[in-house]
Amino acid sequence: MHLVKIACERPDEVGRSLSHWDCTELARHLVADQVVDSISPQTVQRILASHKLKPWRKHLWLSSKVPRDADFVTRVKNICTLYTRKLAPHEMVLCVDEKTSLQPRTRLSPTLPAQPGLPVRVEHEYQRKGALNLFAAFDTRTGKVYAHTAERKRQAEFIEFLEQLDRDIPAYITKVHLVMDNLRMHTGKQVQAWLANHARFKFHHPPVHCSWMNQVEQWFSILQRKRLAIADFADKAALAERLHAFVKEWNDHAHPFNWTKKSVTKIMAKCELPLALAA
């Protein structure tokens, strides 16, 4: 069918200056091409629906056929194995990252709670009171979160967080695997010097564009929905206090995220890459 054929082509390939098709533009194009005398967008939508076509929708992807990270498969396999193999009692896997530029916005009027027939009401106008950075580590075995807040985000602040982890993690844990991206802050000379003097810590870096492999990102999503969606904080100190309070509440009922060999196999199939996990 001509409509389906056109819907499966990019508009610029048929001489149209559009980023994507919608039902109105497809209807207009069919008439201009003299395929039909007239057709409504509603009819176009019904035909597309019968073929499960929605050319106005998009999602981002990375083709495995384009050369990128030469160690892509090795790095992915390393991280997935950490998540799925049985850890020894002396081992721990922590997923580490930063949630940056958190703004303590002070509303000009207090936020009002929900009432019957009314949602939560948030004052539209606010005052910015600077910004704060949250360093967090997610324990893949227990779901416990370690957190540190700082006004700046440099190697110095990251090392402060590493020192906190070193103090908080029991001495019987002799191997701490830290999963994190390879930002300069994570791989700079100061951090490498710290790492050389703390033998129980080992860094693992997923490939570029693989933030989805870092489990703390899932926890950041929960934090955003449950604590930061309504931003109403007097200042940076108040924001830091609320963040640490949320972490404490989370840790009272902490749970890990379920990364199984079966789920990892599905992920790798979508990446078009075979992956043999360790037994």
Protein language model features and the residues they cover:
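Extended, low-complexity cationic-aromatic segments
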Residues: 73-163, 269-274
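RNase H-like polynucleotidyl transferase catalytic core
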Residues: 120-126, 197-215, 231-233
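C-terminal domain-tail junction helix/linker
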Residues: 106, 238-279
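Short, basic/hydrophobic alpha-helical segments
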Residues: 156-176
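Active-site proximal helix-loop segment of RNase H-like, two-metal nucleases, encompassing DDE(D)
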Residues: 216-238, 249-251
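Short, basic alpha-helical nucleic acid-contact segments in DNA-binding proteins
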Residues: 46-60
